[in-house]
Structures are given as structure tokens and as C-alpha cells.
């Protein structure tokens, strides 16, 4: 019996050890519950932040693309927290048109930021002023989106890049064509259809009859036709589209050289800047021709991609055609709008800032790609002035 008793005794734990184990288990349960609760609260907080509109300040109203941001408010992704515009009459004109509260109009960007504390700023002033916007916003951690192109010069662009990287902000460039379903489908067809071979030539047509001819307002026309404020004429205004698309389609590759010819076909209307520009980008195995003009018979933004044995044409925002192999007939399609947030610049801006999507270096809006765009435009201006091909 003593043997049986000893065996049983070994199996039983002392009472104080059992109580201690129970206490430990309770503490572990409470800790686990607390951790789960904290994670749930954090997740809820992140989700709530994601659902809140991005608070954007507007820097300047002299670029008429500013109508775009007012129209985008209805999507629910952004809130315009304030407007910085020194021209009070112009600011009140927009406020009246869009029923915007006039007590949120400020004379300077610094005043707007101090009063409204925006998360981000969208610049709709002259291209020359883009640098100043970044100089004000970057040290404060405020993200920035500018209208195309990134900067008035390569020097400005590199300074803006340095500030954005130093202070960890997003700096995006908005192009109308970035939101075209056709350009994205063209790239997808090119990538998916290996049978058509590599790119041999890209031809980009952008422009309209001329800014004065289409009736842009005086505030826009004044700086758009100023070589200091705009950097050039049609070369800057519409050459940037082709440089952006070409760099994107070439997966970030820079051209070997740039050659440009500019003209003043209407010097009586545009005496200070070019109104016609042709830019040729030479790559090791392909070529891009950018035709930027204020002399087209109608507005156009279209793109042709010639591959070894196929042609893809983005005719406008929604209409695309393609022909693969000489024996095949052309196929034409009409594309629906892209899904949110890829259909609108400000929905996209919000998604980038809130880190709902990842902005890649070769994205059409991304800073590295747009610095390359500025290298191309800088070389194009130097080429047009010298009559020589510029190597990059």
C-alpha cells in the first residue's frame, strides 16, 4: 500500500502550485484580451482614418484645371480645407461658382496652413511657383500634388525632389492622360501580347488650337505665355505629356538623346514663346516622336505604339484600336472608366497618402519618373535653342 500511496503522491501537484498556475493563466488571458482589444481599436482607428476624406488645401487658382478638384469633391474622397490665392477677385469668382465658403480663402499658403492644418496641398498656380509650394509644405510634412509638368526647370525639379525625399512627403504630378483607360490598356496589350514584339516607335500628339483661341481666362493666359513662369510655350504645355508617357512605356528608361525643333507660327498672338514643338527621343532600339502644338485644328491627346509586328492606338480617353500582324484586321474597342481610385487624380492622391496603394517609381504620377520628364524637357529646350542633338 505504501508503494501505491507514493505513486499517487507523485501525480498530485501541491495546492499552492495549482493556484499559481490558475493565476498565471488568468493573467495571460487578460493580457491576450487586452492585446486583442488594442489591435481592434488600432484597426478601427486606421479604418476610420481611411474612410475620412483627405483634407486638401488649394495653392493658387490661376491654372484652370482647378475646376477638376472642385468637381472631384462630390466623390467623397477629399475635402477642400482652404484656398490660398492673392487675387481676391479671382478667388471669390471660384467661391461663387462652387458655393465655397469665403472665410476659407487666404492670401498666402502659410496663412492657409496655419489656420486649416491640411494633410495635403494641390497646386494650381504657375509652374514656376511649384517649387515655392514644396518649400513651404515639405518641412511641415504636408504632401503635394502639382499640375503637369513637375517644375519650370530641371534645377527646380531636383530641388523639389531633394525636399520631398528629405522630409518624407509624397510629391505627385497630375496629367490628364494618367486617368485615361486607353493608355493603361495599351500598355497591358503590349505587355501581354509577346507576339507583337518590342516597341519600335511611339508617336504622341497633344494640344489644341491655342490657349487664346480656346478662350482660357486672362489669369491663366498671362503666365502660360510667359517663358519665365511656364518655361516655354507648347513645348512645356504639351511636350510634357509625351515625355511622361514615353518614359512610362519604356519602363523608366531614359533616352540616349533628345532633339527638338520649335516654331512661332502665330508670333502675333504668342510673341514670347513657341506655339509648335516636335521632340524626338532616341532609345537604343526605339524612337519616340512628341508632337506638341497650339495649332491643331481641334483638341487632341492620342498615342500610337508601333511594335515589331503590331500597332496599338489610344485614340482618346475611352477609344482604343489595335492590329496585330499584317494579316489581321484592326480591332476597335470602347473602354469603361477605370475603377476607383484610379479614375480620378484626387481619389488617387488620397489613396497614396493613406497608403491604401503603393506608388511605384515608374508610375505616371511618381516623382522619379517626373524628374526624368524634366530632364527630357530641359534637353529639348537646349536642343531647340542650339539646333543640336542633346545627349543624356
Language-model regions, residue ranges each:
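Rossmann-fold dehydrogenase core element
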Residues: 159-177, 200
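Predominantly a Rossmann-like dinucleotide-binding segment in NAD(P)-dependent oxidoreductases
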Residues: 180-261, 265-269, 387
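N-terminal Rossmann-like dinucleotide-binding module
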Residues: 38, 42, 46-98
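Beta-loop-alpha module in the N-terminal Rossmann-like domain of NAD(P)-dependent dehydrogenases
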Residues: 98-163
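Hydrophobic residues in well-ordered beta-strands that form the structural core
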Residues: 58, 146, 171-173, 314
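C-terminal helix-rich "cap/oligomerization" subdomain common to oxidoreductases
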Residues: 120-122, 348-392
Amino acid at each position: 500500500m505504501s508503494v501505491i500511496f507514493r505513486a499517487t503522491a507523485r501525480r498530485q501537484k501541491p495546492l499552492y502550485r495549482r493556484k499559481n498556475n490558475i493565476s498565471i493563466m488568468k493573467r495571460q488571458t487578460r493580457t491576450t484580451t487586452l492585446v486583442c482589444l488594442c489591435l481592434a481599436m488600432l484597426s478601427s482607428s486606421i479604418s476610420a482614418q481611411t474612410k475620412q476624406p483627405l483634407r486638401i488645401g488649394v495653392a493658387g487658382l490661376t491654372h484652370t484645371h482647378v475646376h477638376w478638384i472642385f468637381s472631384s469633391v462630390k466623390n467623397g474622397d477629399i475635402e477642400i480645407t482652404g484656398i490660398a490665392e492673392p487675387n481676391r477677385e479671382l478667388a471669390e469668382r471660384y467661391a461663387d461658382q462652387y458655393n465655397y465658403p469665403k472665410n476659407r480663402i487666404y492670401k498666402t499658403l502659410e496663412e492657409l496652413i496655419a489656420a486649416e492644418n491640411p494633410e495635403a496641398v494641390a497646386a494650381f498656380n504657375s509652374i514656376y511657383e511649384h517649387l515655392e509650394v514644396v518649400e513651404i509644405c515639405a518641412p511641415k510634412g504636408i504632401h503635394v500634388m502639382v499640375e503637369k509638368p513637375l517644375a519650370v526647370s530641371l534645377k527646380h525639379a531636383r530641388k523639389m525632389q531633394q525636399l520631398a525625399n528629405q522630409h518624407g512627403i509624397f510629391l505627385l504630378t497630375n496629367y490628364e492622360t494618367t486617368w485615361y483607360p486607353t493608355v493603361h490598356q495599351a500598355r497591358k496589350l503590349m505587355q501581354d501580347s509577346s507576339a507583337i514584339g518590342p516597341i519600335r516607335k511611339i508617336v504622341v500628339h497633344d494640344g489644341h488650337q491655342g490657349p487664346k483661341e480656346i478662350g482660357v481666362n486672362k489669369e491663366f493666359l498671362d503666365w502660360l505665355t510667359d517663358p519665365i513662369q511656364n518655361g516655354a510655350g507648347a513645348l512645356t504645355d504639351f511636350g510634357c505629356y509625351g515625355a511622361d508617357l514615353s518614359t512610362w512605356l519604356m519602363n523608366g528608361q531614359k533616352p540616349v538623346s533628345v532633339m527638338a525643333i520649335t516654331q512661332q507660327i502665330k508670333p502675333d498672338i504668342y510673341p514670347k514663346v513657341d506655339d509648335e514643338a516636335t521632340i524626338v527621343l532616341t532609345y537604343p532600339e526605339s524612337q519616340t516622336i512628341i508632337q506638341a502644338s497650339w495649332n491643331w485644328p481641334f483638341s487632341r491627346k492620342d498615342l500610337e505604339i508601333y511594335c515589331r509586328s503590331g500597332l496599338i492606338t489610344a485614340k482618346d480617353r475611352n477609344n482604343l484600336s489595335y492590329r496585330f500582324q499584317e494579316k489581321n484586321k484592326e480591332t476597335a474597342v470602347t473602354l469603361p472608366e477605370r475603377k476607383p481610385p484610379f479614375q480620378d487624380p484626387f481619389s488617387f492622391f488620397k489613396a497614396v497618402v493613406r497608403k491604401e496603394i503603393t506608388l511605384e517609381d515608374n508610375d505616371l504620377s511618381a516623382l522619379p519618373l517626373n524628374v526624368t520628364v524634366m530632364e527630357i524637357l530641359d534637353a529639348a529646350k537646349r536642343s531647340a535653342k542650339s539646333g543640336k542633338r542633346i545627349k543624356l
